[in-house]
Structure formats: C-alpha cells, structure tokens
C-alpha cells in the first residue's frame, strides 16, 4: 500500500506568517521603491543566529528588519499556529526535522554558524530512512535533553499585541504596522 512507499515527516515550526501580509509588504516596497529583483526571508549570510531579510530593488540591496521583527514578536502568525495540534511531544510521524537550536551549548564542537539540523526518529521506518541518508550527512548522536526546544512540545504563544496589530493593520495598513511594530 501507499504507507509502504511514503514516509511521514513533520517539522519543528515557530509558525507561519500571513501570506497576505507578506504579499502586501512586497507590494508596498515595490510601489515606493521600484521593481523588486528579489526578496528573501531568514537569509543566513550572517549566520543563522542573526537571520535577516533582504530586498533588492533597482540593483540596490538592503536589509529589511521591520518584517523580521514583526515575525519574531509573534504578531503576524496565522491564528492556527497558536493552537497547532502538531506541536506536541506525541509525534505520529516517522521522523521530525528542524533547526537544532542551542547546539553550541550542548555539542559545541559540532556547531555550524550557518545552522545545524535536527532529526528525531520516531519509528522503525524513520530509522530505516535515516540509515539510508546518514552517509551523506555529518551526524552526531544527541539526546532529548540536548535538543529540547519549546515548539517540540507546545505551539508558539500568541503575542499580547496580536489583536492590536491586526486591528491596526485593518484600519491603517501595512506601512503603519511595519513602522509601529517593526
């Protein structure tokens, strides 16, 4: 059956921001500055500890810190993110993947400033899949204490400013909320 051919993998997730907000943000930049060549989010050129978004307009590149701040202050996430049924220790998948936060504290000799991935194996099928790919990876064995992070057991907490943010957005628009909250 299909279960023999498909692996079920879930992702450790902080949350997903509103696609409408991202689209309007890009449209606002383009309207004010000109055609966007590219717009990136969580760019790692300065390492994963200081992710920045960049926009390139008319050949000039610049960081965009306001949107990043809005993302990390948890105002712009989708409502379902705050009640995510998958952010739990009871995973029903073969494997969980995500960023290995705080690895520099728990396995310092393995820390990579561009990021380390975390694989949590839940089933024999997940273990079999990992055995197939681990030869292509540089791996270290860890334990749940070393790799624990908040979104492994609970959804992201809703910002106390979320309702105010969305009310401001609906009344005053994207530029206003980016200036006020970003």
Task: Indicate residue ranges for each PLM-predicted region.
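Short, conserved secondary-structure transition motifs
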Residues: 12-24, 46-47
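Ligand-binding grooves and catalytic loops that recognize ribose/phosphate and carbohydrate rings
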Residues: 19-35
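Long, compositionally biased charged/polar accessory segments in the mid-to-C-terminal portions
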Residues: 30, 34-182
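Conserved small/polar residues in nucleotide/adenosyl-binding loops
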Residues: 1-2
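Short, acidic/small-residue loops that bind anionic groups at enzyme active sites
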Residues: 5-13
């Amino acid at each position: 059956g299909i279960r023999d051919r498909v692996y079920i993998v879930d992702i450790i997730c902080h949350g997903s921001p509103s696609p409408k907000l991202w689209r309007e943000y890009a449209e606002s930049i383009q309207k004010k500055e000109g055609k966007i060549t590219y717009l990136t989010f969580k760019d790692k050129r300065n390492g994963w500890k200081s992710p920045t978004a960049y926009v390139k307009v008319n050949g000039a590149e610049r960081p965009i810190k306001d949107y990043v701040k809005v993302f990390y202050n948890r105002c712009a996430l989708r409502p379902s993110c705050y009640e995510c049924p998958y952010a739990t220790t009871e995973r029903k998948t073969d494997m969980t993947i995500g960023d290995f936060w705080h690895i520099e504290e728990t396995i310092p000799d393995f820390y990579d400033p561009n990021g380390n991935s975390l694989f949590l194996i839940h089933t024999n099928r997940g273990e079999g899949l990992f055995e197939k790919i681990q030869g292509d990876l540089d791996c270290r064995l860890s334990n749940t204490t070393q790799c624990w992070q908040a979104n492994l057991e609970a959804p992201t907490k809703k910002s106390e400013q979320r309702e105010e943010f969305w009310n401001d957005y609906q009344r005053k628009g994207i530029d206003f909320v980016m200036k006020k909250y970003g």
